[in-house]
Swiss-Prot record:
Name of the protein: L-gulonolactone oxidase
Primary enzyme class: oxidoreductase
Residues the record lists as Pros-8alpha-FAD histidine modifications: H54
Lineage of the species this protein comes from: Eukaryota, Metazoa, Chordata, Craniata, Vertebrata
EC number(s) reported in the record: 1.1.3.8
Gene that encodes it: GULO
Function: Oxidizes L-gulono-1,4-lactone to hydrogen peroxide and L-xylo-hexulonolactone which spontaneously isomerizes to L-ascorbate.
Main subcellular localisation: membrane
Subcellular location: Microsome membrane; Endoplasmic reticulum membrane
GO BP: any one term: L-ascorbic acid biosynthetic process
Cellular-component GO terms for this entry: endoplasmic reticulum membrane
Length: 440
């Protein structure tokens, strides 16, 4: 029989959201999860499944039953002929990478953070960059879903296809993802080339940059014209790195955190800090080569608040210039660097922010130096206004102020997803406060 724990406090990685579930479970088998769901049905409790806890919002929070999938973390099957791997949903991508390395395989695209689970990373619509590549969930070829009534559904394009179309970005509201089968590619190395540019140059030549590099993104430093362009492309060069502890940590983390803390008393310093650190750390060309997963992912050092919306790719220039103009017109509104801009191809996943359109993701950030919150409301609201104006859709894992009315306008298939959810979970067992705002 599965045993739960009382008094466990859950906090997300950034320590910006937390909750105290009534019971906290760490099941080791499907039968143990079934027991938790049966208990929840008997006691009329809500259930939330969590993985790595990296979502910077309350999407994972509940005061009911919490299921942590960390003990269901095995690689179940590697199909070398199809280049596919089947894993339990609780496996961290950081633990999957070395397993794929052993078989000469890799995932074709990854997000920046690998301390996330296979089930969670697809459920929130996690993405990287590359206009020829989709969000991470597009690499899923099959998944198994345990529904609230205890039924296991095997879902793919040929089996339970409608549920599959919904469950690849499931928001944790359809049931418990048990296993995920991912389409891999042969192991490959990437060369990352970083060089300075300007916002005008990048926006004027956006199509050219997108063609030049398979995984192109750029970082804009607000309160300036400064941009750091990042190309990542296949290479046969041996691993090499320009990493340096003094510049990456002593300057890029410790000094930056101290100066950002000072700026909470003198907000006008933020523009100077952005320009100073661009000059200090980003004003020259750098190259790194390594296995793909070591280039895609990087250490996320700062606790932070973020927003990340996907807009139609053709609206990139308009939206960024409007954000820049807003900051220039309102000097008391400050914005930490960077605004990270990435690109992703269209897909057919019902609640994917890239549903039926090539997209540009525009991620804004406000750090929490020494855990201190920095005023961000004016920046947040202005950004959201611009994103909505150009047809944006918010990242599901990240905080936003949207409601069902907004999502019905944003997503052509929103009502179809709702119908699937209501059929699978008619009592709302897998809802929480975050999801109630989405669906009601």
């Amino acid at each position: 029989m599965v045993h739960g724990h009382k008094g466990v406090k859950f906090q997300n990685w950034a320590k910006t959201y937390g909750c105290c579930p009534e019971m906290y479970y760490q099941p080791t088998s499907v039968e143990e999860i079934r027991e938790v769901l049966a208990l929840a049905r008997q006691q009329n409790k809500r259930v939330k499944v969590v993985g790595g806890g990296h979502s910077p919002s309350d999407i994972a929070c509940t005061d009911g039953f919490m299921i942590h999938m960390g003990k269901m973390n095995r690689v179940l099957k590697v199909d070398m002929e199809k280049k596919q791997v089947t894993v339990e949903a609780g496996i961290l991508l950081a633990d999957l990478h070395p397993q794929l390395d052993k078989h000469g395989l890799a995932l074709s695209n990854l997000g920046a953070v690998s301390d996330v689970t296979a089930g969670g990373v697809i459920g929130s619509g996690t993405h990287n960059t590359g206009i020829k590549h989709g969000i991470l969930a597009t690499q899923v070829v099959e998944l198994t879903l345990l529904t609230p009534d205890g039924t296991v559904l095997v879902c793919s394009e040929s089996s339970n296809a409608e549920v599959f179309q919904a469950a690849r970005v499931h928001l944790g509201c359809l049931g418990v993802i048990l296993t995920v089968t991912l389409q891999c590619v042969p192991q490959f190395h990437l060369q990352e080339t970083t060089f300075p540019s300007t916002l005008k140059e990048v926006l004027d030549n956006l199509d050219s940059h997108l063609k030049k590099s398979e995984y192109f993104r750029f970082l804009w430093f607000p309160h300036s014209e400064n941009v750091s362009v990042i190309y990542q492309d296949h290479t046969n060069k041996p691993p090499s790195s320009s990493a340096n502890w003094f510049w990456d940590y002593a300057i890029g983390f410790y000094l930056l955190e101290f100066l950002l803390w000072i700026s909470t008393f003198v907000p006008g310093l933020v523009g100077w800090i952005n320009r100073f650190f661009f000059w200090l750390l980003f004003n020259g060309k750098k190259e790194n080569c390594n296995l793909s997963h070591k280039i895609f992912t990087y250490e996320c050092r700062f606790k932070q608040h973020v927003q990340d919306w996907a807009i139609p790719r053709e609206k990139t220039k308009e939206a960024l210039l409007e954000l820049k103009a807003m900051l220039e017109a309102h000097p008391k509104v400050v914005a930490h660097y960077p605004v990270e801009v990435r690109f992703t191809r269209a897909d057919d996943i019902l609640l994917s922010p890239c549903f039926q359109r090539d997209s540009c993701y525009m991620n804004i950030i406000m750090y929490r130096p020494y855990g201190k919150d920095v005023p961000r409301l004016d920046y947040w609201l202005a950004y959201e206004t611009i994103m909505k104006k150009v047809g944006g859709r918010p990242h599901w894992a990240k905080a936003h102020n949207c409601t069902r009315k907004d999502f019905e306008k944003m997503y052509p298939a929103f009502r179809k997803f709702c119908a699937i959810r209501e059929k699978l979970d008619p009592t709302g067992m897998f809802l929480n406060a975050y999801l109630e705002k989405v669906f009601y």
